[in-house]
Amino acid sequence: MARVKRGTIARARHKKVLKQAKGYYGARSRVYRVAVQAVTKAGQYAYRDRRQRKRQFRQLWIARINAAARQNGMSYSRFINGLKKASVEIDRKILADIAVHDKAAFSALVEAAKGALA
């Protein structure tokens, strides 16, 4: 059996990890053993937060819609229920955008929701 020297492979792997850890503080960006842990943990956080980002944006949209709906004298849940009954199919992302940038259009939507509930 021939002897296998792994220097090139190991160096390449070390370089890859240290490149990923570039910008980290202290030993996390310089020492391979510490950098591996830091990069692994960063990957776990990234994986988790890609899923959490979707939840957080939905929470933000709902908070904005709720605030705008209450300014027009209606709660969030009644507003959404009214829109469904009025068969207005606008998602929360667009509703939040309208609430922030176009108050008149949002007021019209609130009136439509009130009309459907009455």
Curated annotation (Swiss-Prot):
Keywords: Ribonucleoprotein, Ribosomal protein, RNA-binding, rRNA-binding
Keyword Transcription: no
Keyword Ribosomal protein attached: yes
GO MF terms, alphabetically ordered: rRNA binding; structural constituent of ribosome
Listed GO biological process terms: ribosomal large subunit assembly; translation
Pfam families per record: Ribosomal_L20 (PF00453)
One annotated Gene Ontology cellular component of this protein: ribonucleoprotein complex
Function: Binds directly to 23S ribosomal RNA and is necessary for the in vitro assembly process of the 50S ribosomal subunit. It is not involved in the protein synthesizing functions of that subunit.
PANTHER family to which the protein is assigned, alphabetical: 39S RIBOSOMAL PROTEIN L20
Family: Belongs to the bacterial ribosomal protein bL20 family.
Protein name, per record: Large ribosomal subunit protein bL20
Provenance organism: Alteromonas mediterranea (strain DSM 17117 / CIP 110805 / LMG 28347 / Deep ecotype)
